[in-house]
A protein has these predicted regions:
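Catalytic cores of large soluble enzymes that bind and process phosphate-bearing ligands
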Residues: 50, 75-79, 98, 145-146, ...
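Catalytic adenosine-cofactor/nucleotide-binding cores of aminoacyl-tRNA synthetases and other
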Residues: 207, 219-361
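Short, histidine-centered active-site or binding-site loop motifs used for metal coordination
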Residues: 8-12, 42-44, 189, 193, ...
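Active-site cores that bind ATP or allylic diphosphates and position pyrophosphate for catalysis
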Residues: 93, 97-228, 233-240, 248, ...
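Conserved S/T- and glycine-rich ATP-binding loop of Class I adenylate-forming
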Residues: 90, 144, 305
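N-terminal Rossmann-like or analogous alpha/beta NTP/dinucleotide-binding catalytic cores
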Residues: 1-115, 207-221, 261
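Short, structured secondary-structure boundary patches
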Residues: 57-65, 91-95, 115-126, 244-248, ...
């Protein structure tokens, strides 16, 4: 059996979302529990929005909460030629085809689907057509030839057995008409080349998983295990988005939430072990498993985060608390001067009993 290998694959287009942090945490904990490796892949193929400073901030944010990846970062944009090569291999195998539908044709198909109140699925016009009939002046996309008959089943390590009718999966694009690969192709090729054994991600990726499994099968590659974790919702029960307040890791560190407290909270957000609430880092690694992840969305509750943070402030060793406070002030307030250090340290035993955040202190 292969050594367990997991990954977290953010796009460097902005600050790290709290949902992404939990996904990274679950991947990291699972790999450590299984004595495996955890890898970071930077999905930076969106050249307009991807920024080096965002990549640096993502790595810093993960490190802040205690997550460090093994080896070098895997940079997706450096592997584009590999993705294109696989698209062409699929074409040669007969597992993909060139589609010459114009933008206008596709829009008309989508319009008809909307009128009938049906989900849009490409009509597979060019699936079995002769390329000799290809119109001039149109650059084709390459589409994967998805299964049409029967059902596909997935043994999801969190959700259980999941089944889908194959005719609901369209012949999805793997190479755009400008020659650039799409997400489902790139992610599959990268995961294969990186030797990933377990793909742990949000359950909004379930349909992508069925598409990606077909690419694995068409290429004759080993298919990894998949686990889809429920998304995080707001306290009102709506899907948490980047537009919500306190949706990024920076939002929490800025108000004085301690990394250990936030990590403990995110661990318990959708995962449980007996009736235990507080976990040290070592305990988290020892007890974490995929069986403990629930199937329903979890609600992000700020009052519980503050309560967890208050517990850590009150119980942490005062030397460690001072170091956290010193680092917090250096980044968000003003650096603590040496002549104030003794006074602050002597006051911590009193101040920590009145505080829920480092900002309160």
């Amino acid at each position: 059996m292969s050594k367990v290998a997991t990954r977290f694959a953010p796009s460097p287009t902005g600050a790290l979302h709290i949902g992404g942090v939990r996904t990274a945490l679950f991947n990291w904990l699972f790999s450590k529990n299984q004595k495996g490796t955890f890898h970071l892949r930077i999905e930076d193929t969106d050249k307009e929005r991807s920024k080096e400073e965002h990549k640096i901030q993502i790595i810093k944010s993960l490190k802040w909460i205690g997550i460090e990846h093994d080896g070098e970062e895997y940079i997706q944009s450096q592997k584009v030629e590999d993705h294109i090569k696989i698209a062409n291999e699929l074409l040669k195998k007969g597992s993909a085809y060139k589609c010459y539908c114009s933008t206008k044709e596709i829009e008309e198909q989508k319009k008809r689907a909307r009128q009938k109140k049906l989900p849009y699925i490409y009509n597979r016009k060019w699936r079995d057509a002769d390329e000799k009939d290809a119109p001039k002046g149109i650059k084709p996309v390459i589409r994967f030839k998805s299964k049409i008959e029967g059902n596909s089943k997935l043994k999801d390590l969190v959700q259980g057995d999941v089944e889908i009718e194959n005719n609901t999966i369209e012949d999805f694009i793997i190479l755009r008409n400008d020659g650039t690969p799409t997400y489902n192709l790139s992610a599959t090729v990268d995961d294969h080349q990186m030797g990933m054994t377990h793909i742990i991600r949000g359950d909004d990726h379930k349909i992508n998983t069925f598409k990606q499994i077909q690419i694995y099968q068409a290429m004759g590659w080993d298919v990894p295990e998949f686990a889809h974790i429920p998304l995080i919702h707001t306290i009102e029960g709506k899907k948490l988005s980047k537009r919500d307040n306190a949706s990024t890791l920076d939002d929490y560190s800025k108000i004085g939430i301690m990394p250990d407290a936030l990590r403990n909270y995110l661990l318990r957000l959708g995962w449980s072990y007996q009736d235990k609430e507080i976990f040290t880092l070592d305990e988290s690694i020892e007890h974490f498993n995929l069986e403990g992840i629930g199937k329903s969305p979890s609600k992000l509750d700020m009052s519980r985060i503050l309560s967890m943070n208050e517990h850590y402030i009150k119980t942490i060793d005062e030397k460690d608390l001072y170091q956290c406070l010193k680092e917090y002030c250096k980044i968000y307030k003003e650096e603590i001067q040496d002549d104030k250090e003794t006074k602050i340290k002597s006051s911590l035993s009193f101040l920590k009993n009145k505080a829920k955040t480092l900002e309160d202190i």
